[in-house]
Swiss-Prot record:
Family that this chain belongs to: Belongs to the peptidase C48 family.
Biased composition (Low complexity): 381-399, 898-910
Residues covered by region (Protease): 747-1037
A Pfam family of this chain: Peptidase_C48
Name recorded for this polypeptide: Sentrin-specific protease 7
Subcellular location: Cytoplasm
Sequence ranges of Basic and acidic residues compositional bias: 310-320, 330-340, 879-890
The keyword NAD is assigned to this record: no
Record keywords, A-Z: Cytoplasm, Hydrolase, Immunity, Innate immunity, Phosphoprotein, Protease, Ubl conjugation pathway
Gene Ontology cellular component terms for the protein in this record: cytoplasm; nucleus; postsynaptic cytosol; presynaptic cytosol
Organism: Rattus norvegicus
Compositionally biased intervals (Basic residues): 1-10, 289-299
InterPro entries recorded: Papain-like_cys_pep_sf, Peptidase_C48_C, Sentrin-specific_protease
Residues forming the catalytic site: 847, 926, 979 (nucleophile)
Primary gene name: Senp7
Amino acid sequence: MDRARPGRRRASSEIVTEGKRKKSSPADLQKITKLLTVKSEDVLAQSPLPKLRGSECWWTRSLRNKVICLDHKTTKAAHGCPPKALPKRHLKVMLTNVLWTDLGREFRKTLPRNDAKLCDTSKVQSDSLPSTSVDSIETCQRLDPLHQSLNLSERIPRVILTDIRQTELGRKYLKIPSVTEASLSDTASPKSEELSSSADGSLESCQNVNHLKSFLSERGSKPSRTGDISAKEAANGRQEQGDDGDIAPEMVTPQSKDFNSGNKGDYHEEGTSNKNTSYSHSETDHTPVSRKRKKRGRSNFHNSHNPKSSVDKSTEYIKEEENESTVSSKLEESNEDSHQDPAPPEGLTPDSLETEATNVCSFVVQEPDVSAASGRACSPNKSSESSVSSEVAENSSAAEKGEASTVKEAPPPGGNSEENQLLMSAEPIVVSSDEEGPVEHKNSVILKLQPSQDYEFMSENQTTSDPQLSELMLGACESVQVSSELCPYNPDMENISCINPNSEMDLKLDFIFTCVYIGKIKGTSKGCITFTKKYIKIPFQVSMNEISLTVDTARLKRFGLWESKDDDHSKRSHAILFLWVSSNYLQDIQTQLENPMLSQQSKANEFIFLELNSPISQREELKLKDIMMEIGATNGELQLSCPLPWVQAFPLFQDLSPQEISFLHYYCASASSFPAVAGADMKKKPVSQPSNADVVKPTYTFLHKQSSGCYSLSITSSPDEEWREVRNTGPVQKLIVYPPPPTKGGLGVTNEDLECLEEGEFLNDVIIDFYLKYLLLEKASDELVERSHIFSSFFYKCLTRKENNLTEDNPDLSVAQRRHRRVRTWTRHINIFNKDYIFVPVNESSHWYLAVICFPWLEEAVYEDFPQTVSQEFQDQQSQHDNKTIDNDPHTTSTVFTSAEESQSTETSMSVPKKMCKRPCILILDSLKAASIQNTVQNLREYLEVEWEVKRKTHREFSKTNMVDLCPKVPKQDNSSDCGVYLLQYVESFFQDPIVNFELPIHLEKWFPRHVIKTKREDIRELILKLHLQQQKGSSS
């Protein structure tokens, strides 16, 4: 081959010169093929190369988690020698370990002690690759002193591997992190081949030495290596052997190959600017965009590893450093975060690290087992016994989408077309020492190499877009496994909520909700509900009022999170967040809501239901539980550590009516809307029924017995079988007649009437009339009896009932007259205008209330002096109230209760004017205020007009001015069935504590205590049974 020809021939069908592609001639191809197909018997006999597949050979030695690769063809030249000194015979490579052979031990004895000069070979490094034969000869002459200093023999020995740890050279390299691997390429076979002794081989060797050294610094921090480095190291070995015939064993200590997220970031950042990228064992695609970086890397290797070589540092390298300052600063930050070496390598500057990080690895797919110690594993001392295993990727071709590996070496901008280098491939071979210790897989990196049989060369103008490169890199890294410590959370877990971290590490969580239910109140969302350790903020709107409710977490008792499991297609959310606050916190909630509907007596106000916009994610649920655990630990509520299930929460409010708790009324109106329990418990039993464990079986039973006029109560043990209530199916039996004979007008009470005295039953008219007669005859004073009259419960019903017009005798009568004719006989023996108080029980729509006609004989209000008896009685009652010596006997019910307001107003009227007011009026005493009061008052006024005409024979108008209607405040019922009981208690309290002063306003809120109502039904039952026994004894005697 002509030495004057500028450039070198590639081992391929293409030659790249100054950015242009030229086809090589068939003669050149045949010559290259002949050189690459020479086989060696020594290699076949002593090396395991034929056992490996592919067309490439790698030597890999595990040392401090590093990889050393050496080509078996690097026996052409040592480091540099004149072409005339090359031997005439061809070299053969023997693969062996110096620790295993006698040749290795003999060679170790011949090694010089001053091994520092071996590194001086890097002084021959120039700023750019030599492109002419003259430069090649000068480079080889520089290498002569090195080989002479080593006293190597003239013969060409076989290449052997030296354990670098046993030499001073190795001890020196152990102090600094060096390259991770050196790839030596081979394109023909794993066997030794005959080397050319021509001048071209020498020239190529000299040129390859420079380029090899330029990329060693880049291998220090990259997970993959370039194929041209392998070719240059192979040429380096051939140059050494052609010089003196002796070998210069040069071992490079690999650097740890543990990478963290910082390296990956640099890797992908540089990958976005690359051209067409593919993968192979020993070939690397260098980007044309980074020509300056490659050139800088070629001229910077020795300077970065040997501080003495600063004299040879070129000015071009300094300029390149200034141009790449921006990129280097970014890469320096990532490298500083990634590689925290305790002892930085001597002469290795941050700039060189930045340059190394910019090269893209395109033929190796790494599968790191990332751990917390990966950043520290870069230390040479800690990783000296670690190994890096290289294996052939069996299925990586599919991940690469069937593309063949391509390599492209772009010449730097300067017209140096002679820098085209020979690219050869090598098959990986694993070589390790027995003394290296066990392999540490924790910090190791598995390299998957893509073998390639066909070699293609890409032009620098063929580009690969960034999306394609990203897709290629992702496809190659599909098998990468990263530990959970460094792996970010799954974005699929994200939902509508947002977690806001606080600088004080306070937990905070937001949910989007649609509705909130608090007691009777239903509100719509006006933002997100916020959970913190100190408060829960709920913004919502009721009608037109916007409210921001803040719940103190110190008052939180339990919480629940329920999701429905049904598969209906309703658009409504089935995620409910439940909060249970303490009862003593209801006053604060009512103050914030400014809503009187929130009564503190109702248990329903303790429950807050939040209808979420959508079910929460698992990450949000864990965050919510953490917040609740913090609240529970702070406030001592250990029950907050776990949410309350639906089956345990539903019995708390299942007995409440939908009118009291809006959640049951709006959300749980349909069975499908009920939240389901996350488990099989909800499927086994309905939500409306408590579990069997909650049902307590009675241990005894009450028995009521009546025999021979005696009524007895006994207790017996609980029966084995379930007992059912047995109602009396016999004939109706009259228990009493009140008043008893011989008094006329007695009212009979039967055993069926006693049934309405059960809890939850409405009182019938018989019980109402009986007890009113009893109060008038037994409880009222004689004076009140003379001044009072009580109509039957049937009076008002008869007064207002509708009759057929055919039954009317005189159709010319008015409506009021016709009504009066229906009840005209009710007062034939009494003149109601001689009475002060007329009691009219009214039943409308199954609701009882009382109407009291006061002073019907008066036409206007009259003020009179208090009688002595009344004044003295009032003073006695006042003193009893002040001394709190009131008798609360439920049977006698002789207690006198007066309100403070009434007492104060009455005392004022007595002390100052000492007058009492008698006002004609109609008092409406209603415990529920649910009836049409105006119609009732108007009907009674019309009745009084007609009755006045009948009794007084004159006309008098009863209007709103002379017969006003008053509705004083009285004790109210707390259920829907005690209206009749309250009516009876109103009359009883009136007889015990009559209203003597009708000066407005009239306050009767504290007329009687509530516990009197609770025992009233039982008192009436006992009274009827007592009278029954008395009448039975009287009849028997």
